[in-house]
């Protein structure tokens, strides 16, 4: 696990993942895409055809899923009507953008040689990202970390709790994944700044 760095000559952002790491990233990104698209795909009977054509027919209520509520917070907590209108006009495009960013991770890993089914031990995946693609990965890492933190109940200053969990506790393992994605994001930000 070396994280991201900028190649001196090509100026591309590069990382080297084991097959397991690449497959884990693909799985996390795939789960995020599924979450974003499944709730958004619920048909609504009250959609105005013009609004649908202009993509102004998004949801008006805060999502029930806590991860989605964290990814799409209420813009105006003190004004329910304004919050509803803001969500209606923006959430659909935001969901599409977040899903597209996660799909970029999946596509990049597969283009770099990650097979559909990981069967080979010792497989290494070399990823090379131009700046726009690296920025897309960075945005998706933010969404992945928010999703993991929400599911785990991670809060600021609670590191001692997570470190005290036994290694075989599934929550500790999930927190390790959360920390790993944070590490990847940190190295990606650093590589982009060079």
Question: PLM features: what roles do these ranges have?
Answer:
Residues 1-128, 132-194:
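Charged, alpha-helix-forming regions
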């Amino acid at each position: 696990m070396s994280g991201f760095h900028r190649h001196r000559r090509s100026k591309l952002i590069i990382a080297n993942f084991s097959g397991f790491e690449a497959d884990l990233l693909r799985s996390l990104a795939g789960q995020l895409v599924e979450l974003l698209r499944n709730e958004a795909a619920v048909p609504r009977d009250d959609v105005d055809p013009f609004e649908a054509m202009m993509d102004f027919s998004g949801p008006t209520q805060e999502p029930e899923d806590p991860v989605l509520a964290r990814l799409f917070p209420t813009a105006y907590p003190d004004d329910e009507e304004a919050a509803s209108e803001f969500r209606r006009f923006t959430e659909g495009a935001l969901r599409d953008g977040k899903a597209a960013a996660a799909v970029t991770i999946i596509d990049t890993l597969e283009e770099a040689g990650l097979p559909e089914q990981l069967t080979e031990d010792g497989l290494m995946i070399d990823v090379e990202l131009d700046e726009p693609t690296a920025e897309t990965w960075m945005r998706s890492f933010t969404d992945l970390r928010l999703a993991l933190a929400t599911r785990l109940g991670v809060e600021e200053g609670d590191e001692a709790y997570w470190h005290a969990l036994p290694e075989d506790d599934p929550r500790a393992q999930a927190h390790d994944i959360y920390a790993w994605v944070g590490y990847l994001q940190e190295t990606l930000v650093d590589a982009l700044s060079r």
